[in-house]
Amino acid sequence: QNLNNGPHWLGLLVDSVDTVLALEPDHAALKKLGTKVGVAARRQAPAGSLIRRANREARAFAPSTHIANDPTDLEVRAFAAPVGIAEDPVTGSLNASLAQWLMADGHMPAAYSARQGTVLGRSGQVFLSQDTHGQVWVGGDVVGCIQGTVNL
């Protein structure tokens, strides 16, 4: 899916969280592709309900039990080799674009949470919601990694 809410992403919805977490992308090939790629999978989604709501492409989904007690609804990975970032631990622009697409196509409800950064050991959780006007909002907590002052 072509995703563009300012930053451009190629979005992929795959069959399971296990598939997302097992990806070993060729970053040189992704850099040549020239666009950032986001990959996501629903966590513990009822397979039948997703198949019934599939749009023109044939899609088959199966629930994952990779992280059995994880409260999040979606697992996300962001590969941004074209801008010099092999994998980003948590990406607001990607999660917002994914939410616009997945909510519009009925794959996700109007409010859900996503986990990203698991493979990097920098797991983060974001909360996504769509208001009554159709605007998608992204929120979450931050972990400060560095603090300082820049004098210009």
Predicted features along the sequence, with ranges:
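Active-site proximal loop and beta-alpha junction motif in alpha/beta enzyme cores
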Residues: 1-152
